[in-house]
Amino acid sequence: MTEHILSIILFAPFVGVVLLFFIPNEKPTLVRTTAAIAGLIPTLASFYLLYAYDSAAGGYQFTEQYVWSKDLGISFFLGVDGISIPLVLASSILLFTGVFISWHIVDRPKEFYIFLLILAAATIGVYVSLDLFFLYFFYEMSVLPMYVLLGVWGSHTKGYLEMADKQKRDSVGFIFNFTSNSKEYAAMKLTLFLSAGAVVALIAILIIYATSGLNTFNLVELQAHGQVPDYLHGLLFLLIFFGFASIAPIWPLHSWSPVGHAAAPAAVSMLHAGVLMKLGHFSIIRVGYTLFPEATREWMPLAAVLCVFSIVYGGLVAYFQKDTKYVIGYSSSSHMGYVFLGMAALNVMSMTGAVLYMFAHALATGMLFAVAGFVYDQTHTRDIPSLGGLSSRMPFITGIFTVAVAASFGLPLTVNFIGELMILVGSWEIYPVQTIIAVLGIGLTLAYLFRMMRGVFYGPMNPHYAHVHDASPFVDRLPLLVMAATSIYFGLFPSQFIHVIQAGVTPLIAAIQGAGPVPPAGGPF
């Protein structure tokens, strides 16, 4: 079983998809149960990966390789290291919990779960692929289910619905993307942004393939024996960076993300913010850092500049939002700036923190979106000024939201605190100005999340929502408890996680530092 564990993790959702095709629509309980099992299997297997990975040996482990096309140099090559294991685990957890968060969907639940499983499997495929062809294949595969899930099961914003003239509201929504968007617009914008970035990354991958002299997409062979001309390294790194940064998303390539968050169903928002956005960071590390260490050292100061705009801009815009999902969406864009800061500092401490923070953010934002979705299902509004006082009717949901808020701003005892602290400590020596701004950004996080908490759960209660009820004992509470407990557990006992991540980060940073010292703060900018 161990030698095929990555295949089990990757293909369990796909097997679930096949089984769902044969289940009649008239049996929704069986549909949901099948989807839950398809999410549970990779979750349990991913926890096994974390504790079975040999940190002392490091490198890629649990590898599987099957030649797909010898002439083209394409192989189905799977493997994980300390960088990918946390993200595989996050993807699996959010798939499993997302199935339960979506338990009450009544509009074509079978089709919804089919696309949800495909989305999760595609993200896992990116994280476990050691062949550039399949890494890109799974990356592109993630776009289609997102488009369908947003366009079919998504929701319009309040501003869009309040505009009487449909033709006018569509035109306004297309120009001003803050409050007047349709779900179709959100789906199309997300698809266009991600596809455009993917094309840029594809150009880089094809140039690597054509100039490496190896006739292979195998990342391990390209890293060890690739002969890409030195004069192309900088260009290829920039193509990889901006191609994949569009999904990360870094400012100014971020505008699709909050729109997509607002339109998506809760479970899709969880996967979107929790793992889909991390495809960008991971792919930059896996392809750009691995193949072009010297170009990484020369150009990552650019990310140190852009990440400040992401942190501050995302936080400020989040503070002034009235839609709960827009607050969380811009919050996610802001927090991804911390990941880029950790990546830009290029030392073991900051990079370990960046990878750990990606996992931590997946859990925290998963809880936030799950709670926002539950409140919306009960009240049919995401308008913060219209809500208030729900804590008296939803004590459990309020408690989970409090844990999520605490995790989001990095309260001790949550895994977010460990990751955030490592990023700030690791980046201080290289980028002190950016680090100070990042610390101030934590204050912004407190401000907009406390404002949202007060507006939704405290203060006078709107009598229009006196009928709402708390989460049901099992279906609604289980996924929230899983995410909260995991965040707190790894916040209390982070050593195993840190050792695994450092096993993947340390040789990568050594290769980059071997190319020369990291440029001073700001680099050439």
Annotate the PLM regions:
Residues M1-I5, L19-F100, H104-I114, N218-A224, ...:
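Transmembrane helix-loop-helix hairpins at membrane boundaries of multipass inner-membrane proteins
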Residues V17-K27, L95-V106, V148-L161, I247-A262, ...:
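C-terminal ends of transmembrane helices
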Residues E26-P28, E111-I114, I118, A122-V228, ...:
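Alpha-helical multi-pass transmembrane bundles of energy-transducing inner-membrane proteins
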Residues W251, T365-F369, Q434-H469:
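Predominantly late transmembrane helices and immediately cytosolic-facing juxtamembrane segments
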Residues T2-A12, V80-S91, F133-P145, H233-F244, ...:
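Structural signature of hydrophobic alpha-helical transmembrane segments
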Residues M1, I124-L132, I285-W299, V339-L356, ...:
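Helix-coil boundary and interhelical linker segments in multi-pass alpha-helical membrane proteins
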Residues S7-F22, A36-L49, V88-S102, L119-A120, ...:
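Central hydrophobic cores of alpha-helical transmembrane segments in multi-pass inner-membrane proteins
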Residues D54-S75, K158-L192, A198-H254, V259, ...:
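Juxtamembrane/interfacial segments at transmembrane-helix boundaries in multi-pass membrane proteins
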